[in-house]
Structures are given as C-alpha cells and as structure tokens.
Amino acid sequence: MQRLSTESIQSFDAGSTSADGDARQALGDDGVVCLRGAFEASWLSIVEDGIVAALAGASVDLEVVKREGDKGQFSFSSGAWQTVEPFQRFIFDSPLADLVWPLLDSSTLTLFYDFLLIKEAHSDSALTPWHQDHSYYPLDGTKVVNSWVALDHIPLESALRFLAGSHSSSTLYRAVDFDDPSAAYRHARSELPLPPINQDDRILVTSLQPGDMLVWWSHTLHCAPGNRLDRRRAAFSVNWLGDDVTYNGQPALDTYIDPLLSSGDHVVGDKFPLVRQSVAPNG
C-alpha cells in the first residue's frame, strides 16, 4: 500500500452533550469523524458473544479467507443481525442509534445492514483497497453512513485511511473487486475510475481503542492495510440510512437487496427496519 502523509481524524468524546454539532460539522467537512469511548466494555462483550455465535454458524453469510503466505485468516460476515441475537441486542439496545442519528440531519434512521470483520494476527495480505461503500449499494440519496466500532486496540499501522472531503460531490466511482482490484466488479454501477491518491491529498487516520467508533459517509473513499500485528484486529460496523435514501433496484449483493421494494421506494421494511423517527408536532 502506497505510503502517504496523514492527518488525524477529528475526534470527539461520545459522552459530551456538545459533541453532536461539532461531530456533525466534522463529518460534513471531512467525510469521517471519530467518537471516543462510545461503548462500554459490557456492550463490547455482547458483540463478542455474537462473534462466537457467528463463527459457529449462526451467520448465514460468513466468509473465511486465508491468503497464501499469511499465518492468519480474514473472516467477515454481512447482514447477520436477524440470526445472531447478540448482534441484534447491540444494534437495537445499545447507545448506537442515538449516537449516529444526530449526525445524519435526518428525520428518520433506518438499519441497512451489519458487517463483522476480523483480521487475525499476521493476516498481512488482508488489505482493503481504496473504494467507496456507496458504489456497491442499490440506493439513491446521500444520507448513508457506516458506524464502525473498534473491538480491539487498533494502532495507526493497521488503521483505516480516508481521503478527506471525497464525499462532498457525491460522485459515484467504479466499484472495486476486493479479491482482484484490477478486475471488473460484477455489479458495477459506474465506470468512472477512482481518482489517483497523491501525496498532496489529505489522508485522515487515527488509532482506536476498544469502544471507539468511526462514522463515515458512504461516498467517502477509504482503505485499510492488512494486519501485521501479533494479535487480532476486529470491528463490528452497522450501516444506516437517512430520509433522502431510495431504492433503485440495480443488481447488488443479496445483503443489500429487498425483493419487496420497487425502484423509487423509501428503504424500509422487515429487512431494513425503521429504528428512529422524529415525532411531528401536533397541529
């Protein structure tokens, strides 16, 4: 992965009553923000219970990859909340939704999907290439965010990197095939290639402690290195939709598709439940 000069992601204390406005501004400016100390150890323990269940077969969309030459494997699971009860508890009962919702400037908050990723010790080749999440989604609109909760201490050398401000134009780039970034992705929505990432660009990164949470817009370009550490590097992320998002029905992975929705529909239903909604004033 190319070495680039970096700046720190703007960070705020998740427990501060004044953090919402500042964090929302940082997210709007840079495309990513960090909320420190978002979750206590008791909530992380619930996620760990979910990991045990998911790896034991409760997740119907679990993949385990061990690349040639790596000592460790890379495991990931998508859309497991309906079959992994501890994940469901974390998503609906923890402070998660109430931390994320104010950042969207939206009258609603809808659960899109969850994503578990575990890079075991010395999964050196399990890097994540530069990409944007939105290019994989059958969605129109801009209020789509990923809330990414660190389960381990993540030092700078294994942390996510973000291209500051890359969300601002809502440009949709060509989706990247993670197994072979040079290959065409099967569900590509755009043929516009990713812009070159240069030394002059503002690359944002920060180390994380367990319970810290990154939040970024789905149009924000980001990447991550493999895990060269002697220990696990794991996170549990939950993706959310705001009130301007509609379904467009384009081909995508099953996790993102609901056959009960039609093009132009607001994305809500049993698969994508409404979690928060503003109460309209009387009269």
Regions found by a protein language model. Name each.
Residues 107-109, 113-114, 126-128, 143-149, ...:
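Generic beta-strand structural signal
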Residues 96, 106, 121-124, 153-156, ...:
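Short, charged/polar surface micro-motifs in flexible loops or helix N-caps
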Residues 1-13, 60-65, 69, 173-177, ...:
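Non-heme Fe(II)/2-oxoglutarate
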